[in-house]
């Protein structure tokens, strides 16, 4: 069995979950971590007994990576993915995939052209409740799905947005609560009914 060599780009809040998921597997090895903040990269690397980098392209060029996990602010997902796919490195990126259609399409095209896999993190599909609903729908136990309604009631404190300079910004986050939290629920609906969206009708207020 091949052991996949993995690098993680971004050592922020979500980093520990990605690192743990890699290190608990017998078929994967965390060989390097990268962050533009040198102290943070060095701290995580020391904790996990791995190498630290401060430039993800340098990490990709130096290490023989099979996969990178991208844990960066939303607007940086596309350039980091492009850097990986052109080097024929598989990508697992945090959601959302990108902050606009053009970036998302470029990411998909780059992965296809270079024969690598591009994955996006939507972990709620693996929650026990989500699995139960999916199985009941797939088996026909609940009958045919005619319509669905999403309601998201998550709350985020002011501190959540104040702790970084990109959260809650259109140009870097890409759409506030819709793209940061509600995207999980929208993904579940698509997965439950096994269908893509035909049209979107939306409103927003504050």
Question: Language-model features: where?
Answer:
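Short active-site oxyanion
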Residues: 28-32, 48, 66-68, 118, ...
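N-terminal Rossmann-like dinucleotide-binding module
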Residues: 1-48
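Beta-loop-alpha module in the N-terminal Rossmann-like domain of NAD(P)-dependent dehydrogenases
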Residues: 18, 50-110
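Predominantly a Rossmann-like dinucleotide-binding segment in NAD(P)-dependent oxidoreductases
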Residues: 124-206
């Amino acid at each position: 069995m091949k052991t996949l060599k993995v690098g993680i780009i971004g050592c922020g809040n979500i980093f520990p979950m990605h690192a743990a998921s890699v290190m608990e597997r017998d078929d994967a090895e965390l060989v390097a971590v990268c962050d533009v903040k040198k102290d943070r990269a060095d701290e995580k690397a020391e904790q996990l007994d791995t190498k630290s980098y401060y430039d993800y392209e340098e990490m990709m060029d130096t290490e023989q990576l099979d996969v990178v996990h991208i844990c960066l602010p939303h607007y940086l997902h596309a350039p980091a993915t492009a850097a990986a796919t052109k080097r024929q490195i598989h990508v697992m990126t945090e959601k959302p995939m990108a902050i606009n259609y053009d970036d998302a399409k470029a990411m998909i095209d780059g992965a296809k052209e270079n024969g690598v896999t591009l994955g996006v993190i939507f972990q709620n599909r693996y929650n026990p409740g989500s699995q139960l609903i999916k199985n009941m729908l797939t088996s026909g136990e609940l009958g045919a799905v005619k319509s669905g309604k999403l309601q998201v009631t998550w709350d985020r404190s002011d501190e959540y947005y104040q702790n970084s300079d990109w959260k809650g910004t259109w140009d870097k986050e890409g759409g506030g609560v819709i793209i940061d939290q509600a995207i999980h629920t929208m993904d579940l609906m698509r997965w439950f009914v096994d269908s893509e969206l035909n049209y979107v009708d939306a409103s927003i207020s504050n």
